[in-house]
Amino acid sequence: MDEGGMPLLPDSLVYQIFLSLGPADVLAAGLVCRQWQAVSRDEFLWREQFYRYYQVARDVPRHPAATSWYEEFRRLYDMVPCVEVQTLKEHTDQVLHLSFSHSGYQFASCSKDCTVKIWNNDLTISLLHSADMRPYNWSYTQFSQFNQDDSLLLASGVFLGPHNSSSGEIAVISLDSFALLSRVRNKPYDVFGCWLTETSLISGNLHRIGDVTSCSVLWLNNAFQDVESENVNVVKRLFKIQNLNASTIRTVMVADCSRFDSPDLLLDAGDQAGLPCRVFDLGGDTEEEATDPGLHTSGSGHVKEGLRRVFDSVLDGHGQLSDCALETKVAELLAQGHTKPPECPDADSRNKYLIFTTGCLTYSPHQIGIKQILPHQMTTAGPVLGEGRGSDAFFDALDHVIDVHGHIIGMGLSPDNRYLYVNSRAWPPGSVVADPMQPPPIAEEIDLLVFDLKTMREVKRALRAHRAYTPNDECFFIFLDVSRDFVASGAEDRHGYIWDRHYNICLAKLRHEDVVNSVAFSPQEQELLLTASDDATIKAWRSPRIVRVLQAPHPRPRPFFSWFASHRR
Protein backbone atom coordinates (compact mmCIF):
# COMPACT_ATOMS: atom_id res chain seq x y z
CA MET A 1 0.00 0.00 0.00
CA ASP A 2 0.99 3.62 -0.23
CA GLU A 3 3.35 4.92 2.49
CA GLY A 4 2.41 8.58 2.17
CA GLY A 5 3.53 8.79 -1.45
CA MET A 6 1.64 8.26 -4.68
CA PRO A 7 -1.25 5.76 -4.47
CA LEU A 8 -0.67 2.49 -6.29
CA LEU A 9 -4.25 2.48 -7.63
CA PRO A 10 -6.20 5.47 -8.91
CA ASP A 11 -9.32 6.44 -6.95
CA SER A 12 -11.57 5.59 -9.90
CA LEU A 13 -10.35 1.98 -9.94
CA VAL A 14 -10.68 1.63 -6.15
CA TYR A 15 -14.20 3.03 -6.48
CA GLN A 16 -15.13 0.43 -9.11
CA ILE A 17 -13.74 -2.36 -6.92
CA PHE A 18 -15.67 -1.10 -3.90
CA LEU A 19 -18.88 -1.09 -5.95
CA SER A 20 -18.66 -4.87 -6.15
CA LEU A 21 -18.31 -5.25 -2.38
CA GLY A 22 -20.96 -5.37 0.31
CA PRO A 23 -21.33 -2.66 2.97
CA ALA A 24 -19.34 -4.52 5.65
CA ASP A 25 -16.49 -5.28 3.23
CA VAL A 26 -16.35 -1.63 2.11
CA LEU A 27 -15.98 -0.48 5.71
CA ALA A 28 -13.31 -3.10 6.40
CA ALA A 29 -11.37 -2.11 3.28
CA GLY A 30 -11.52 1.52 4.37
CA LEU A 31 -9.26 0.65 7.32
CA VAL A 32 -6.35 -0.29 5.03
CA CYS A 33 -5.04 3.17 4.18
CA ARG A 34 -6.00 6.83 3.96
CA GLN A 35 -6.80 6.64 0.25
CA TRP A 36 -9.15 3.68 0.68
CA GLN A 37 -10.67 5.33 3.73
CA ALA A 38 -11.54 8.40 1.65
CA VAL A 39 -13.02 6.33 -1.18
CA SER A 40 -15.00 4.19 1.29
CA ARG A 41 -16.89 7.32 2.41
CA ASP A 42 -17.76 8.45 -1.12
CA GLU A 43 -21.37 9.67 -1.38
CA PHE A 44 -22.04 8.06 -4.76
CA LEU A 45 -20.66 4.76 -3.48
CA TRP A 46 -23.02 4.74 -0.49
CA ARG A 47 -25.93 5.82 -2.65
CA GLU A 48 -25.42 2.67 -4.71
CA GLN A 49 -24.93 0.57 -1.59
CA PHE A 50 -28.15 1.97 -0.11
CA TYR A 51 -30.43 1.26 -3.07
CA ARG A 52 -28.90 -2.16 -3.64
CA TYR A 53 -28.88 -3.36 -0.02
CA TYR A 54 -32.34 -2.11 0.97
CA GLN A 55 -33.88 -2.74 -2.46
CA VAL A 56 -35.47 0.70 -2.58
CA ALA A 57 -36.89 1.91 -5.89
CA ARG A 58 -34.46 4.28 -7.61
CA ASP A 59 -37.09 6.99 -8.01
CA VAL A 60 -37.46 7.32 -4.23
CA PRO A 61 -35.34 10.26 -3.06
CA ARG A 62 -33.24 10.35 0.08
CA HIS A 63 -35.00 11.20 3.33
CA PRO A 64 -35.20 15.02 3.49
CA ALA A 65 -33.63 15.11 6.97
CA ALA A 66 -30.64 12.94 5.98
CA THR A 67 -27.24 14.61 5.70
CA SER A 68 -25.48 11.89 3.68
CA TRP A 69 -26.11 8.50 2.09
CA TYR A 70 -23.63 6.88 4.48
CA GLU A 71 -25.45 8.24 7.54
CA GLU A 72 -28.80 7.24 6.06
CA PHE A 73 -27.56 3.69 5.49
CA ARG A 74 -26.31 3.63 9.07
CA ARG A 75 -29.64 4.93 10.42
CA LEU A 76 -31.60 2.07 8.88
CA TYR A 77 -28.97 -0.51 9.82
CA ASP A 78 -28.00 0.61 13.31
CA MET A 79 -30.92 2.61 14.76
CA VAL A 80 -33.88 0.25 14.30
CA PRO A 81 -35.10 -1.37 17.57
CA CYS A 82 -34.56 -5.00 16.61
CA VAL A 83 -32.43 -6.41 19.48
CA GLU A 84 -34.39 -8.09 22.28
CA VAL A 85 -33.18 -6.74 25.62
CA GLN A 86 -35.87 -7.81 28.12
CA THR A 87 -38.89 -10.12 28.39
CA LEU A 88 -41.63 -9.28 30.89
CA LYS A 89 -43.63 -12.25 32.16
CA GLU A 90 -45.81 -10.73 34.89
CA HIS A 91 -49.03 -11.22 32.90
CA THR A 92 -50.63 -14.67 33.18
CA ASP A 93 -52.66 -14.58 29.95
CA GLN A 94 -52.62 -13.02 26.49
CA VAL A 95 -51.34 -9.42 26.43
CA LEU A 96 -53.62 -7.38 24.19
CA HIS A 97 -52.45 -3.76 24.24
CA LEU A 98 -49.58 -1.43 25.15
CA SER A 99 -49.52 2.35 25.56
CA PHE A 100 -46.76 4.78 26.57
CA SER A 101 -47.10 7.91 28.67
CA HIS A 102 -46.27 11.08 26.76
CA SER A 103 -43.11 11.56 28.83
CA GLY A 104 -41.98 8.02 28.03
CA TYR A 105 -41.28 7.33 31.72
CA GLN A 106 -44.14 4.85 32.08
CA PHE A 107 -46.26 2.51 29.99
CA ALA A 108 -49.40 0.45 30.56
CA SER A 109 -50.42 -3.02 29.42
CA CYS A 110 -53.81 -4.75 29.15
CA SER A 111 -54.40 -8.48 29.17
CA LYS A 112 -56.85 -11.36 29.16
CA ASP A 113 -55.83 -11.86 32.81
CA CYS A 114 -58.11 -8.86 33.53
CA THR A 115 -55.38 -6.60 34.90
CA VAL A 116 -54.05 -3.22 33.86
CA LYS A 117 -50.36 -3.06 34.69
CA ILE A 118 -48.34 0.16 34.88
CA TRP A 119 -44.59 -0.09 34.37
CA ASN A 120 -41.55 2.09 35.02
CA ASN A 121 -39.58 2.51 31.80
CA ASP A 122 -36.02 2.54 33.12
CA LEU A 123 -32.98 0.89 31.55
CA THR A 124 -34.38 -2.20 33.23
CA ILE A 125 -38.18 -2.12 33.06
CA SER A 126 -39.96 -2.79 36.36
CA LEU A 127 -43.60 -3.23 37.41
CA LEU A 128 -45.01 -0.21 39.24
CA HIS A 129 -48.67 -1.13 39.83
CA SER A 130 -51.22 -3.77 38.84
CA ALA A 131 -54.97 -3.06 38.91
CA ASP A 132 -57.22 -6.12 38.97
CA MET A 133 -60.55 -5.32 37.27
CA ARG A 134 -62.32 -8.61 38.07
CA PRO A 135 -64.03 -7.18 41.19
CA TYR A 136 -65.84 -4.80 38.81
CA ASN A 137 -67.25 -7.71 36.80
CA TRP A 138 -64.86 -7.25 33.89
CA SER A 139 -63.95 -10.17 31.66
CA TYR A 140 -60.62 -8.74 30.45
CA THR A 141 -58.87 -5.42 29.77
CA GLN A 142 -58.45 -4.41 26.14
CA PHE A 143 -57.08 -0.86 25.74
CA SER A 144 -55.42 1.98 27.66
CA GLN A 145 -54.38 5.58 27.02
CA PHE A 146 -52.59 8.22 29.11
CA ASN A 147 -54.03 11.74 29.17
CA GLN A 148 -51.91 14.63 27.90
CA ASP A 149 -50.21 15.50 31.21
CA ASP A 150 -49.78 11.83 32.24
CA SER A 151 -51.81 12.28 35.42
CA LEU A 152 -54.66 9.92 34.46
CA LEU A 153 -54.94 6.58 32.70
CA LEU A 154 -57.97 5.52 30.67
CA ALA A 155 -58.45 1.75 30.68
CA SER A 156 -61.24 -0.04 28.84
CA GLY A 157 -62.32 -3.62 28.56
CA VAL A 158 -65.16 -6.08 28.24
CA PHE A 159 -67.79 -5.73 30.93
CA LEU A 160 -69.90 -8.85 31.33
CA GLY A 161 -72.95 -7.13 32.74
CA PRO A 162 -76.14 -8.83 33.95
CA HIS A 163 -76.90 -10.60 30.66
CA ASN A 164 -73.41 -11.60 29.59
CA SER A 165 -73.54 -8.92 26.89
CA SER A 166 -70.62 -7.68 24.82
CA SER A 167 -70.79 -4.17 26.26
CA GLY A 168 -67.69 -2.60 27.68
CA GLU A 169 -66.66 -0.23 30.42
CA ILE A 170 -64.05 2.50 30.77
CA ALA A 171 -62.20 3.12 34.03
CA VAL A 172 -60.16 6.23 34.89
CA ILE A 173 -57.18 5.58 37.16
CA SER A 174 -55.15 8.25 38.96
CA LEU A 175 -51.43 7.85 38.32
CA ASP A 176 -50.59 9.61 41.59
CA SER A 177 -52.50 7.35 43.97
CA PHE A 178 -53.61 4.57 41.56
CA ALA A 179 -57.15 5.16 42.84
CA LEU A 180 -60.08 4.33 40.56
CA LEU A 181 -61.71 7.73 39.93
CA SER A 182 -64.68 6.85 37.72
CA ARG A 183 -66.27 4.18 35.54
CA VAL A 184 -68.20 4.78 32.32
CA ARG A 185 -70.29 2.27 30.37
CA ASN A 186 -69.04 1.73 26.81
CA LYS A 187 -71.00 -0.17 24.17
CA PRO A 188 -69.85 -1.96 22.14
CA TYR A 189 -66.61 -2.62 24.01
CA ASP A 190 -64.46 -2.13 20.90
CA VAL A 191 -65.30 1.57 20.84
CA PHE A 192 -62.37 1.49 23.33
CA GLY A 193 -62.70 5.18 24.24
CA CYS A 194 -60.14 7.99 24.11
CA TRP A 195 -59.17 11.29 25.73
CA LEU A 196 -60.45 14.52 24.16
CA THR A 197 -58.93 16.86 26.74
CA GLU A 198 -56.86 16.32 29.88
CA THR A 199 -59.97 15.72 31.97
CA SER A 200 -62.65 14.57 29.50
CA LEU A 201 -62.98 11.33 27.58
CA ILE A 202 -65.17 9.93 24.82
CA SER A 203 -67.28 6.79 25.23
CA GLY A 204 -69.99 5.16 23.12
CA ASN A 205 -73.41 3.62 23.37
CA LEU A 206 -75.49 1.63 20.89
CA HIS A 207 -79.26 1.67 20.41
CA ARG A 208 -80.94 -0.91 18.18
CA ILE A 209 -83.58 0.46 15.80
CA GLY A 210 -84.18 -2.63 13.65
CA ASP A 211 -82.61 -5.94 12.75
CA VAL A 212 -79.70 -4.32 10.87
CA THR A 213 -80.22 -0.65 11.75
CA SER A 214 -78.93 1.05 14.89
CA CYS A 215 -77.78 4.35 16.30
CA SER A 216 -74.38 5.02 17.86
CA VAL A 217 -74.19 7.80 20.43
CA LEU A 218 -70.80 9.23 21.37
CA TRP A 219 -70.59 10.83 24.81
CA LEU A 220 -68.16 13.31 26.34
CA ASN A 221 -67.53 12.35 29.98
CA ASN A 222 -65.82 14.19 32.80
CA ALA A 223 -63.05 12.06 34.28
CA PHE A 224 -64.04 13.30 37.74
CA GLN A 225 -67.64 12.33 38.43
CA ASP A 226 -68.05 14.08 41.80
CA VAL A 227 -69.97 17.37 41.40
CA GLU A 228 -71.41 19.89 43.83
CA SER A 229 -74.55 20.78 41.83
CA GLU A 230 -77.17 18.88 39.84
CA ASN A 231 -76.88 21.65 37.23
CA VAL A 232 -73.28 20.75 36.38
CA ASN A 233 -72.78 18.20 33.61
CA VAL A 234 -70.51 15.23 34.05
CA VAL A 235 -71.56 13.90 30.64
CA LYS A 236 -72.68 15.48 27.37
CA ARG A 237 -73.79 13.96 24.10
CA LEU A 238 -71.32 14.71 21.32
CA PHE A 239 -72.75 12.99 18.25
CA LYS A 240 -75.56 10.64 17.30
CA ILE A 241 -74.87 8.67 14.12
CA GLN A 242 -77.07 6.26 12.19
CA ASN A 243 -75.68 2.78 11.44
CA LEU A 244 -76.88 0.75 8.45
CA ASN A 245 -76.50 -2.93 7.54
CA ALA A 246 -75.46 -4.09 11.03
CA SER A 247 -72.46 -1.74 11.15
CA THR A 248 -71.43 0.08 14.33
CA ILE A 249 -68.94 2.75 15.34
CA ARG A 250 -65.74 1.32 16.85
CA THR A 251 -62.15 2.27 17.66
CA VAL A 252 -62.54 5.98 18.34
CA MET A 253 -59.48 8.24 18.37
CA VAL A 254 -58.83 11.98 18.23
CA ALA A 255 -56.46 13.81 15.87
CA ASP A 256 -55.32 17.31 16.86
CA CYS A 257 -55.36 19.60 13.81
CA SER A 258 -53.11 22.16 15.52
CA ARG A 259 -50.18 19.74 15.18
CA PHE A 260 -50.44 19.43 11.38
CA ASP A 261 -47.94 22.27 10.91
CA SER A 262 -45.04 20.30 12.34
CA PRO A 263 -42.19 19.60 9.88
CA ASP A 264 -43.32 17.28 7.11
CA LEU A 265 -40.75 14.52 6.75
CA LEU A 266 -43.00 12.10 4.91
CA LEU A 267 -42.68 12.35 1.14
CA ASP A 268 -44.75 10.43 -1.37
CA ALA A 269 -42.82 7.50 -2.78
CA GLY A 270 -43.07 7.01 -6.52
CA ASP A 271 -45.95 7.95 -8.78
CA GLN A 272 -49.15 8.10 -6.77
CA ALA A 273 -51.33 9.39 -9.59
CA GLY A 274 -52.59 5.92 -10.38
CA LEU A 275 -53.98 5.28 -6.91
CA PRO A 276 -57.78 5.20 -6.70
CA CYS A 277 -59.25 7.86 -4.46
CA ARG A 278 -60.69 6.20 -1.37
CA VAL A 279 -61.93 9.39 0.30
CA PHE A 280 -65.49 10.61 -0.03
CA ASP A 281 -66.13 14.13 1.23
CA LEU A 282 -69.66 14.10 2.59
CA GLY A 283 -69.52 17.75 3.51
CA GLY A 284 -69.30 18.99 -0.07
CA ASP A 285 -71.99 19.62 -2.63
CA THR A 286 -70.40 18.45 -5.87
CA GLU A 287 -72.39 16.30 -8.24
CA GLU A 288 -69.85 13.49 -8.15
CA GLU A 289 -70.57 12.79 -4.49
CA ALA A 290 -74.26 12.03 -4.99
CA THR A 291 -74.48 8.45 -6.20
CA ASP A 292 -78.28 8.36 -6.03
CA PRO A 293 -80.02 11.75 -6.42
CA GLY A 294 -83.21 10.27 -5.01
CA LEU A 295 -81.47 9.52 -1.74
CA HIS A 296 -79.85 12.91 -1.19
CA THR A 297 -82.81 15.27 -1.32
CA SER A 298 -84.20 16.81 1.82
CA GLY A 299 -87.60 17.74 3.10
CA SER A 300 -90.55 15.67 4.24
CA GLY A 301 -92.15 15.75 0.79
CA HIS A 302 -89.15 14.13 -0.85
CA VAL A 303 -88.91 11.54 1.94
CA LYS A 304 -92.57 10.58 1.58
CA GLU A 305 -92.20 10.36 -2.19
CA GLY A 306 -89.13 8.17 -1.82
CA LEU A 307 -90.91 5.84 0.60
CA ARG A 308 -93.93 5.64 -1.70
CA ARG A 309 -91.72 4.64 -4.65
CA VAL A 310 -89.93 1.98 -2.59
CA PHE A 311 -93.15 0.42 -1.30
CA ASP A 312 -94.85 0.60 -4.71
CA SER A 313 -91.88 -1.18 -6.27
CA VAL A 314 -92.02 -3.92 -3.64
CA LEU A 315 -95.80 -4.38 -3.90
CA ASP A 316 -95.65 -4.52 -7.69
CA GLY A 317 -93.01 -7.22 -7.51
CA HIS A 318 -90.43 -5.17 -9.44
CA GLY A 319 -87.98 -4.76 -6.59
CA GLN A 320 -86.73 -8.07 -5.25
CA LEU A 321 -85.44 -6.68 -1.95
CA SER A 322 -84.52 -8.82 1.02
CA ASP A 323 -85.81 -7.86 4.45
CA CYS A 324 -82.40 -6.38 5.34
CA ALA A 325 -82.18 -4.39 2.10
CA LEU A 326 -85.70 -3.04 2.54
CA GLU A 327 -84.98 -2.02 6.14
CA THR A 328 -81.80 -0.25 5.08
CA LYS A 329 -83.51 1.60 2.22
CA VAL A 330 -86.34 2.79 4.48
CA ALA A 331 -83.89 3.81 7.22
CA GLU A 332 -81.87 5.88 4.73
CA LEU A 333 -84.99 7.68 3.53
CA LEU A 334 -86.34 8.34 7.02
CA ALA A 335 -82.98 9.70 8.18
CA GLN A 336 -82.82 12.32 5.42
CA GLY A 337 -85.13 14.72 7.17
CA HIS A 338 -83.55 14.07 10.55
CA THR A 339 -79.82 14.47 9.88
CA LYS A 340 -77.86 17.62 10.61
CA PRO A 341 -75.48 18.50 7.76
CA PRO A 342 -71.77 18.83 8.58
CA GLU A 343 -70.85 22.21 10.02
CA CYS A 344 -68.67 24.36 7.80
CA PRO A 345 -65.06 24.08 8.97
CA ASP A 346 -63.35 27.28 10.04
CA ALA A 347 -59.73 28.33 10.22
CA ASP A 348 -59.47 27.66 13.95
CA SER A 349 -56.39 25.51 14.48
CA ARG A 350 -57.81 24.25 17.78
CA ASN A 351 -60.26 21.99 15.96
CA LYS A 352 -59.88 18.26 16.31
CA TYR A 353 -61.01 15.27 14.28
CA LEU A 354 -62.88 12.36 15.79
CA ILE A 355 -61.84 9.25 13.84
CA PHE A 356 -63.46 5.82 14.03
CA THR A 357 -64.20 2.70 12.01
CA THR A 358 -67.67 2.17 10.59
CA GLY A 359 -69.37 0.73 7.51
CA CYS A 360 -72.36 0.96 5.23
CA LEU A 361 -72.53 -2.48 3.56
CA THR A 362 -71.91 -5.02 6.33
CA TYR A 363 -71.06 -5.43 10.02
CA SER A 364 -67.40 -5.80 9.07
CA PRO A 365 -65.66 -2.40 9.63
CA HIS A 366 -64.65 -1.31 6.13
CA GLN A 367 -64.87 2.48 6.35
CA ILE A 368 -63.21 5.20 8.40
CA GLY A 369 -65.50 7.97 9.57
CA ILE A 370 -64.13 11.44 10.32
CA LYS A 371 -66.11 14.05 12.24
CA GLN A 372 -64.82 17.51 13.11
CA ILE A 373 -65.01 18.49 16.78
CA LEU A 374 -65.36 22.24 17.20
CA PRO A 375 -63.93 24.14 20.21
CA HIS A 376 -67.33 24.67 21.84
CA GLN A 377 -67.91 20.89 21.78
CA MET A 378 -64.78 20.08 23.79
CA THR A 379 -66.34 20.72 27.20
CA THR A 380 -69.23 19.25 29.15
CA ALA A 381 -70.43 22.79 29.92
CA GLY A 382 -73.77 23.73 28.36
CA PRO A 383 -77.42 22.72 28.74
CA VAL A 384 -78.03 20.06 31.35
CA LEU A 385 -78.69 16.63 29.84
CA GLY A 386 -82.24 16.49 28.52
CA GLU A 387 -82.48 20.16 27.58
CA GLY A 388 -82.25 21.59 24.09
CA ARG A 389 -83.63 18.58 22.21
CA GLY A 390 -86.31 20.37 20.21
CA SER A 391 -84.69 19.88 16.80
CA ASP A 392 -85.94 17.15 14.48
CA ALA A 393 -82.40 16.68 13.16
CA PHE A 394 -81.22 14.13 15.70
CA PHE A 395 -78.60 12.36 13.53
CA ASP A 396 -75.19 13.91 12.82
CA ALA A 397 -73.67 13.61 9.35
CA LEU A 398 -70.01 12.70 8.95
CA ASP A 399 -67.56 15.15 7.40
CA HIS A 400 -65.48 12.55 5.57
CA VAL A 401 -65.63 8.81 4.91
CA ILE A 402 -62.68 6.68 3.78
CA ASP A 403 -63.60 3.34 2.22
CA VAL A 404 -60.76 0.80 2.32
CA HIS A 405 -62.67 -2.08 0.64
CA GLY A 406 -61.57 -4.50 3.32
CA HIS A 407 -61.76 -5.39 7.01
CA ILE A 408 -60.04 -2.75 9.17
CA ILE A 409 -58.12 -4.37 12.04
CA GLY A 410 -56.00 -1.48 13.33
CA MET A 411 -55.39 2.28 13.16
CA GLY A 412 -52.70 4.63 14.44
CA LEU A 413 -51.70 8.29 14.09
CA SER A 414 -48.25 9.69 13.33
CA PRO A 415 -46.69 11.76 16.15
CA ASP A 416 -47.77 14.99 14.44
CA ASN A 417 -51.33 13.60 14.06
CA ARG A 418 -51.28 14.36 10.33
CA TYR A 419 -51.02 10.83 8.93
CA LEU A 420 -53.43 8.00 9.67
CA TYR A 421 -52.03 4.47 9.32
CA VAL A 422 -54.57 1.69 8.83
CA ASN A 423 -54.18 -2.10 9.05
CA SER A 424 -56.65 -3.66 6.60
CA ARG A 425 -57.34 -7.13 5.21
CA ALA A 426 -58.59 -6.57 1.69
CA TRP A 427 -61.72 -7.96 0.08
CA PRO A 428 -61.36 -9.65 -3.33
CA PRO A 429 -61.41 -7.12 -6.20
CA GLY A 430 -64.91 -6.51 -7.51
CA SER A 431 -66.60 -8.24 -4.58
CA VAL A 432 -70.24 -7.33 -3.91
CA VAL A 433 -71.93 -7.51 -0.51
CA ALA A 434 -75.35 -9.10 -1.02
CA ASP A 435 -76.03 -9.92 2.63
CA PRO A 436 -74.80 -7.60 5.42
CA MET A 437 -74.33 -10.63 7.67
CA GLN A 438 -72.04 -12.34 5.14
CA PRO A 439 -69.16 -10.00 4.22
CA PRO A 440 -66.69 -11.02 1.51
CA PRO A 441 -63.74 -13.24 2.46
CA ILE A 442 -60.67 -11.33 3.61
CA ALA A 443 -57.06 -11.67 2.51
CA GLU A 444 -54.39 -13.29 4.66
CA GLU A 445 -52.02 -10.43 3.84
CA ILE A 446 -52.42 -7.29 5.94
CA ASP A 447 -52.18 -4.03 3.99
CA LEU A 448 -50.85 -1.02 5.90
CA LEU A 449 -52.47 2.02 4.27
CA VAL A 450 -51.52 5.68 4.85
CA PHE A 451 -53.87 8.67 4.62
CA ASP A 452 -53.00 12.37 4.90
CA LEU A 453 -55.61 14.02 7.16
CA LYS A 454 -54.59 17.46 5.90
CA THR A 455 -55.49 16.69 2.28
CA MET A 456 -57.79 13.71 2.94
CA ARG A 457 -55.93 11.62 0.39
CA GLU A 458 -54.10 8.29 0.37
CA VAL A 459 -50.44 9.16 0.09
CA LYS A 460 -48.47 5.92 0.16
CA ARG A 461 -48.44 2.57 -1.51
CA ALA A 462 -49.66 -0.10 0.89
CA LEU A 463 -46.99 -1.70 3.06
CA ARG A 464 -47.27 -5.47 3.05
CA ALA A 465 -45.29 -8.12 4.92
CA HIS A 466 -47.34 -9.14 7.95
CA ARG A 467 -50.07 -11.76 7.81
CA ALA A 468 -53.29 -12.83 9.53
CA TYR A 469 -55.29 -16.03 9.19
CA THR A 470 -58.55 -15.67 11.13
CA PRO A 471 -61.80 -15.37 9.10
CA ASN A 472 -64.21 -12.42 9.24
CA ASP A 473 -66.23 -13.59 12.20
CA GLU A 474 -63.11 -14.31 14.29
CA CYS A 475 -61.01 -11.36 13.16
CA PHE A 476 -59.48 -9.34 16.02
CA PHE A 477 -57.64 -6.07 16.42
CA ILE A 478 -53.92 -5.75 15.65
CA PHE A 479 -52.66 -2.50 17.21
CA LEU A 480 -49.96 -0.56 15.35
CA ASP A 481 -47.81 2.43 16.32
CA VAL A 482 -45.98 5.19 14.48
CA SER A 483 -42.81 7.06 15.45
CA ARG A 484 -40.98 9.89 13.70
CA ASP A 485 -39.28 7.59 11.17
CA PHE A 486 -40.80 4.14 11.65
CA VAL A 487 -44.13 2.36 11.74
CA ALA A 488 -44.59 -0.97 13.53
CA SER A 489 -47.38 -3.51 13.72
CA GLY A 490 -48.14 -6.89 15.16
CA ALA A 491 -49.35 -9.87 13.12
CA GLU A 492 -50.85 -13.32 13.50
CA ASP A 493 -47.69 -14.98 12.14
CA ARG A 494 -45.95 -14.66 15.54
CA HIS A 495 -43.92 -11.61 14.56
CA GLY A 496 -43.90 -7.87 14.98
CA TYR A 497 -42.79 -5.83 11.98
CA ILE A 498 -41.01 -2.48 11.56
CA TRP A 499 -41.06 -0.42 8.36
CA ASP A 500 -39.40 2.85 7.42
CA ARG A 501 -42.08 5.49 6.85
CA HIS A 502 -40.21 7.23 4.05
CA TYR A 503 -38.84 4.34 1.99
CA ASN A 504 -41.75 1.93 2.54
CA ILE A 505 -39.44 -0.99 3.29
CA CYS A 506 -39.61 -3.64 6.00
CA LEU A 507 -36.60 -3.30 8.30
CA ALA A 508 -37.12 -5.93 11.00
CA LYS A 509 -39.16 -8.97 12.08
CA LEU A 510 -39.47 -9.39 15.84
CA ARG A 511 -40.24 -12.93 16.94
CA HIS A 512 -42.71 -14.11 19.60
CA GLU A 513 -44.13 -17.55 20.33
CA ASP A 514 -47.70 -16.57 19.43
CA VAL A 515 -49.78 -13.80 17.83
CA VAL A 516 -48.37 -10.28 18.33
CA ASN A 517 -51.33 -8.09 19.29
CA SER A 518 -49.79 -4.69 19.94
CA VAL A 519 -46.62 -2.64 19.55
CA ALA A 520 -45.58 0.70 21.08
CA PHE A 521 -42.64 3.03 20.41
CA SER A 522 -41.34 5.18 23.23
CA PRO A 523 -42.53 8.70 22.29
CA GLN A 524 -39.20 10.14 23.45
CA GLU A 525 -36.90 7.46 22.02
CA GLN A 526 -37.90 5.69 18.82
CA GLU A 527 -35.00 3.26 19.26
CA LEU A 528 -37.07 1.52 21.96
CA LEU A 529 -40.06 -0.61 20.95
CA LEU A 530 -42.35 -2.84 23.01
CA THR A 531 -44.32 -5.80 21.64
CA ALA A 532 -47.18 -7.69 23.32
CA SER A 533 -48.25 -11.20 22.43
CA ASP A 534 -50.69 -14.02 23.06
CA ASP A 535 -47.71 -15.84 24.56
CA ALA A 536 -48.39 -13.72 27.71
CA THR A 537 -45.14 -11.77 27.40
CA ILE A 538 -44.07 -8.22 26.66
CA LYS A 539 -40.72 -7.87 24.93
CA ALA A 540 -38.53 -4.77 24.89
CA TRP A 541 -36.40 -4.14 21.80
CA ARG A 542 -33.59 -1.62 21.39
CA SER A 543 -31.45 -0.62 18.45
CA PRO A 544 -27.96 -2.12 17.99
CA ARG A 545 -26.51 1.36 18.58
CA ILE A 546 -28.22 1.76 21.97
CA VAL A 547 -27.29 -1.79 22.98
CA ARG A 548 -23.61 -1.06 22.30
CA VAL A 549 -23.80 2.15 24.31
CA LEU A 550 -25.43 0.40 27.27
CA GLN A 551 -22.98 -2.50 27.19
CA ALA A 552 -19.85 -0.39 26.75
CA PRO A 553 -17.51 -0.69 29.76
CA HIS A 554 -17.42 2.42 31.89
CA PRO A 555 -13.95 4.01 32.15
CA ARG A 556 -12.24 3.38 35.48
CA PRO A 557 -11.78 6.53 37.58
CA ARG A 558 -8.32 8.01 37.78
CA PRO A 559 -6.48 7.40 41.11
CA PHE A 560 -7.13 10.87 42.54
CA PHE A 561 -10.85 10.76 41.81
CA SER A 562 -11.00 7.20 43.16
CA TRP A 563 -9.44 8.37 46.45
CA PHE A 564 -11.74 11.43 46.51
CA ALA A 565 -14.86 9.31 45.97
CA SER A 566 -13.89 6.89 48.76
CA HIS A 567 -13.50 9.76 51.28
CA ARG A 568 -16.82 11.48 50.50
CA ARG A 569 -19.40 11.35 53.24
Curated annotation (Swiss-Prot):
Residues covered by the F-box domain: 3-49
Free-text note on domains in this protein's UniProt record: The F-box domain mediates interaction with components of SCF (SKP1-CUL1-F-box protein) complexes, while WD repeats mediate interaction with components of DCX (DDB1-CUL4-X-box) complexes.
SUPFAM superfamilies tied to this protein: F-box domain, WD40 repeat-like
Source domain of life: Eukaryota
Keywords from the named record: Cytoplasm, Phosphoprotein, Repeat, Ubl conjugation, Ubl conjugation pathway, WD repeat
WD repeat feature ranges: 90-129, 470-509, 511-551
Listed name of the protein: F-box/WD repeat-containing protein 5
